[in-house]
């Protein structure tokens, strides 16, 4: 059975299971709920945010972009700690495994400070903390809500979340070499 067929079946099973158990959120609960980024963690697109999922939430998500497919299993472990397991299929020019590289990784996201009226929420996290190191990166991010519909995030990242010629990681993580797929 192909990877995409397994992914489609998993999605249908999860949808059917959640359809019966899902309960609508009240408007006040929805305003402070985090969205999931392409890595299955709280954030927008590929950038983390200093928000958390509701306590006890389990999420399954998948993304496809530029030939890469990621399947994410996210869970709110404790009130301030989010974790995610990821399995990814990445196009590889080396020809390994029918032209694809298969990667797995584990992330965590810790909300250190909750948002106050005049102070942002602050979170620390590590992407691909346990795994091959392909997506490895660490970050500290602050998020502040402006009104009920707008959130602004800013932060500092290392590893995959940093630019070229940036300074060394102060935590000492991320010394693993990335892979070149070209």
Label each PLM-derived region with a short phrase.
Residues 1-37:
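Cleavable N-terminal export/targeting peptides
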Residues 25-137, 143-150, 154, 158-163, ...:
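Transmembrane beta-barrel domains of Gram-negative outer membranes and organellar outer membranes
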